[in-house]
Each structure stands twice: as structure tokens, then as C-alpha cells.
Amino acid sequence: MGWFTGIACLFWGILLTARANYANGKNNVPRLKLSYKEMLESNNVITFNGLANSSSYHTFLLDEERSRLYVGAKDHIFSFNLVNIKDFQKIVWPVSYTRRDECKWAGKDILKECANFIKVLKAYNQTHLYACGTGAFHPICTYIEVGHHPEDNIFKLQDSHFENGRGKSPYDPKLLTASLLIDGELYSGTAADFMGRDFAIFRTLGHHHPIRTEQHDSRWLNDPRFISAHLIPESDNPEDDKVYFFFRENAIDGEHSGKATHARIGQICKNDFGGHRSLVNKWTTFLKARLICSVPGPNGIDTHFDELQDVFLMNSKDPKNPIVYGVFTTSSNIFKGSAVCMYSMSDVRRVFLGPYAHRDGPNYQWVPYQGRVPYPRPGTCPSKTFGGFDSTKDLPDDVITFARSHPAMYNPVFPINNRPIMIKTDVNYQFTQIVVDRVDAEDGQYDVMFIGTDVGTVLKVVSVPKETWHDLEEVLLEEMTVFREPTTISAMELSTKQQQLYIGSTAGVAQLPLHRCDIYGKACAECCLARDPYCAWDGSSCSRYFPTAKRRTRRQDIRNGDPLTHCSDLQHHDNHHGHSLEERIIYGVENSSTFLECSPKSQRALVYWQFQRRNEDRKEEIRVGDHIIRTEQGLLLRSLQKKDSGNYLCHAVEHGFMQTLLKVTLEVIDTEHLEELLHKDDDGDGSKTKEMSSSMTPSQKVWYRDFMQLINHPNLNTMDEFCEQVWKRDRKQRRQRPGHSQGSSNKWKHMQESKKGRNRRTHEFERAPRSV
């Protein structure tokens, strides 16, 4: 019983060690990594690979009511069916030849720049969309009719009504645009000139005069790149509604030593109509603050992620306080990394109610403004809630003057918990896009993030509380390749109604489901280990979780992913209906090497090998060394000996749960026996060898001998020696053939000459037989 107790203690120690390593380590590693081929074979991705004369599928508009996804691209606007994007309609909207020639004469690229790249695509009313494009460096806008009802099947361009797109769409297709259409008015952050230097936040359309940010003042905007725009209520009074712009820009002089990029959030009041004597047709309520996304470091030196790439607003029960998710990357070309930070709107409002940034001159540092702040406070919307002013045109002159010279806040906005919820620095990609879905699970609600990258992959990540719901950690569930070739993901939309994710890039559009519960496995433990809020064990399979289902049939543990607690009573079911044990038989040659391949589906699983000798029940752990080398794909056994024959068991250990994946039976053949088998047919000994030799063709014999020598011959030290032997044998055989070939050739030549006289009149071509 002593050896049995030792094995039991060893087994339990391995489980505890694996569980500790799992808890301390691999949540930042995708548990499942699915290639594009695997996604296609499992019917988990549908791709639209674009048109030959189009590209840049970057502008998305999701319409859940009509079940359509509108996509703006180069010279085209598409209407995709949300159920299957293979079903689509298209509108062709190119520029005229005159515009294209003018663009070419201006020195622009005729293929990459001199076209109509759609940059704005918004719902205008119940029957029309509003679209704007670059128009070959001549921005243009128009309306698109989509009908009253989905069954109308209308998708038509209003080509009789075109508008100037200046201040709505950029001239340059490489520039980003953020836009929002509310109550017939278009808010847009874009460049308003051909050279791409006059950046501004505009409000156009509607019945009011167009309005914009102050021009040529770096304190307001300093070479910005706009990301997104959102309407967020400030109170229950609609007059207090504000539009928030997210962008990145160059740091203001004196704000940072050297050149740097800062992420910003800017605000404007929806009912801002400009000043009366100063800031006429300019925003009077514009304020901006820096968004911080950094990792605290030693000695107070933080690692900053300043390049804002994308923003997603997760609505809550209180429409005034959505959660802001931001995707950031580093500015450095040496250190490349990505991060996701969360912000609360209460923190944003607290910063906008804080001190203004102020400095007395160009050579002074920025400090908090200590003087008297005029009333009403600059940045406050004119309404009955916060003051007695009905319009920004009624604001006192000192308020307008102060607002013009103090557009920036001194304090930055820090993320929730003062640090990112996810960081990636050790990979060959960077984050580009994000959408978030709030999912009801057995033990609460979880936010599932879908993050796009610049190599065409999508990461599925869930935020899980460690000890409290305020202390979150990210668990990377899946990494999916959604395009055939690596490409930057530039647009993403999530349909909660269809439970589908839609992805845009330069190459095309992809569609994939939010959940793939069946790929996790056919056992309760495998479903539980996945920690996917969308999935639960229903008693017979890993399937979609629905909160209304009967509680007793659901097994799910997102917070801990502990199968030992939730699936222990179903272990018998798992063994019979779950993962089936794969068995293999491998033959190896004494003194040669062989490889035992075993790769678990989960990248977080710890692989554990056991060895069982012939005719023995006892199993022992395999120790690595010079004789046995462990790799990520399996075990490499060098210099095989007869004692290595036996059963090799490959186990996967994850979160304390052990699963046997593979049983390999290794048979080691001694060298003398192999040489006897290889050369018996040449010597003519042995009746069995003769029978096998008679049933094999000469080419099969040579191939078998070459193959066995290549993989198992103990006397061949290098591949060169083997190739040299094969080359010598082939050369010897070729030397023996010329006599026979020459005879056949002469015979055919004689036949040709005998036929020449008969064929001279017709000059027909005589084709040689295949054997020559």
C-alpha cells in the first residue's frame, strides 16, 4: 500500500499545483484560439469578401428594427441582412470623372484617395438615412430612402438632392470622423479644409445657423483625431442634454515635455447657439479634459496608454450614467501595448465641475485657475435647472470671455479603480475596436467585451470580480480569426436581438455569433471551465443560458470556473457521454527518437504525463531530462530503449480538474529485428517476407525502406547521409536504364522514318507514345 499512498499524494499535489498556477497565471491567455479555417468549418463565421471595385468597409449603422446593417465603403453603400450578410443590397455612388481628374491633378492617389469614401451614415428620420462621403476631396452629402417598413424593401439614393459636405465629412479619406444626428441636426468632428489642418466640431443641418469650435486656437483643438460622439442626458430636463466627443490630440504647449498625444473627452450643450458679441456662431459651452489610462509603476512613473482608438458606451438603468469603455494603445514605437479602461460619467462630471487649466503666458506652466469664476459657470447649459438664462446668446460677456480662454480642465479623468481592466503588451497585435454586451448569468450580470485587433482577430473577454464587484479582472475566453488574411478591424457593431457580431475592415465584412457553446465540449466540467456567461450545462449538453430556465438543470460558474464543485455529481455522465479517450499505437526503433503528440483544446490547461509499463497496473509520473523532452505539442523521447515500451497517458489539468485526453501504446523494436525485416527481401530468406514481397510493387518496397531508414535508422546521423544514399541508388538505377531506353527510342525512330513518306502530303503531326 506504500506505493499507492505515494501515488495518491503525488496526484493530489499535482492538482493543487495546477490549481494555484491557474489562479495566479493564465487568465490573460485565450482559453480557446480558433483559426479562420476552424471558424469556417464550424459555421461560426460568415464573410463578405468585398467587391473588386470597392474597399474600406469602415462606416457602420445598425438598424435593429429593420434587421439591417448599413455599411459605407468606397463608392458604395450596402444594406446587409442581419440574419445573414450574404443577403445584401447595394447603392453605387461614385464621383464624376471631372472630380476624379481634378483630384488626380492635385497630386492625390487616384485609387486610394480620388474616390467617394463614405464617412457619415446616420438615421435621419423614419424613412431616410443621411450619408456623406469624401467625394474625391470634394465632400458631398445626400439622403437615402429606406421606406417606412422593413417589408418595403426600399434602398434608393436621392440623386436629385446633393449637399455640400464641408464640415460634415473630411476631404481626406485617411482622416477619422465622429458624427451624431439628433433632431435633424448633425454634430460632427472633422477636418474642414483640403489640407486637413482646420479641425473643428460642427453642428450643421437643421434650422439654425451652423456653429463650430474656435478656429486656429490650439487651446481648443490641437490637431485632433475624432473617435466618436454620444448624447448623454445631464438631468431629467432635456435642455441640459450634452453631446460628448471622444478624440485624441497633440498635447498643448507646456502640458507635456516634448511631443505627446493625449486622449480627450469634450462636451458641448445641445442648446448652445453661440455668443451674442463674442464667440458668434462658436460654441460657448465647449470644455475638454484628459482621459488617463495608465498602469502605476515603481517610483511614481506610470506607463501611459494615450492613443485612444475606440469608445463604447454601456447603458445602465440610469441613462445619465452609462459606463464608458475605451480602447487605448501606446504612443511609443519601441514599447507597443494596448489597454481597456472603464470610466464613470460621475467622474467625468466631477472633473468638468473642477478647476480650469490656466497659465499666464507661453513660458509658464499650466496651473489650476485660482481666480473668480464668472456666473453662470462656463460649460453650464442655459436652462431653468442651473440658472435663469434661456439662451447662450444671453450669457454675460465675462462668461463668454472666460470660456474662450479656458476651454481645458486642469484635472484629468481617471479610470474606475485607477487602472486598466485589461492590458496586452506581449503580443504582435494592438487593439482597434470594442463593443460590450451585458449578459445575465446564474450569479449576476457580466460585461462581455469583444475587442478587435489590427491583425483581423477578435478577443472575447469577460470581466469577473475577484473579491468584490468593484475589483474586476479580465478572463480571456476566446481569440478568433475572422478574416482570411490579416487586416485591421476598423468597425464593429453588436446586435443583441440577433445575438450576432458584425465586423468591418478594408477587405470586407464578417459576421459571427456571440456564443459558440458547443465548441467547449460535451461534458459538464468542460462547460463549467469555459466560464462563458452565455453558456451553461443544461443536463445533457453545453448550450445557451437563459435566465428563465429551471434552476435545477443549469450548471454554471463564471466567477470561479470550478467544475469540482458544480459537476462532481455528474462525473459518471461525463465519463460515458463526454470526452472519449483517444488511443494510439506507435512503433519506434531502438536508439532512435519518437514524438508523442498531445495538445489540449484549452490553452490554459496544464499537461501531465504518466507512464504504465507492460502488464503492470502501477502508473508513474514522467520526469523530463536528456532522455525525455517536453514541448507544447507533446513529448519527445530520444534514444529509445526496450524499457520505454508501454502505455503513455496524457492528462489535461485545469482549475483542479483532471481529464485524460490520450493513451499512447509505444512498441520499441530492437535494431537487429528491424534490419532483419528490412533486408530479408533482398537476401531471399523467410517465407513471410517472400509473401509480403510478392504483394508489394518495387516502388512500394523502396518507399517503405526509405521511410523507415529516415525516421528510425540508428546509424544515420544526418539527413545528408540518408539523401546521399538515396541519390547514389537512383543514379545507379538510371545508369542501367539507357540500353533499354535507347532500344525503344531506336525502334520508334525507325517507325517514324518509315511513315515520313506517307505523311509528307498531309504534314500531320505524329505524337509519340507516353512510354517514350
Swiss-Prot record:
PANTHER family: SEMAPHORIN, SEMAPHORIN-3A
Assembly mode: Interacts with PLXND1.
Location relative to the cell: Secreted
GO cellular component: axon; cerebellar climbing fiber to Purkinje cell synapse; dendrite; extracellular space; glutamatergic synapse; plasma membrane
Cited function: May be involved in guiding growing axons towards their targets by forming a molecular boundary that instructs axons to engage in the formation of specific nerve tracts. Binds to neuropilin. Involved in the development of the olfactory system and in neuronal control of puberty.
Sugar-bearing residue positions: 53, 125, 591
Residue span of region Disordered: 677-698, 729-772
Residue ranges of domain Ig-like C2-type in the record: 577-665
Protein's name in the database: Semaphorin-3A
Compositional bias segments (type: Basic and acidic residues): 677-691, 750-772
Annotated Basic residues bias: 729-738
Induction: General decrease in dorsal root ganglia in response to injury from dorsal rhizotomy, with the greatest decrease evident 21 days post-injury, returning to comparable levels 1 year post-injury. Decreased in dorsal root ganglia in response to sciatic nerve transection 3 days post-injury, returning to comparable levels 14 days post-injury.
Position of the signal peptide: 1-20
Keyword vocabulary terms for this entry: Developmental protein, Differentiation, Disulfide bond, Glycoprotein, Immunoglobulin domain, Neurogenesis, Secreted, Signal
Lineage top rank: taxon: Eukaryota
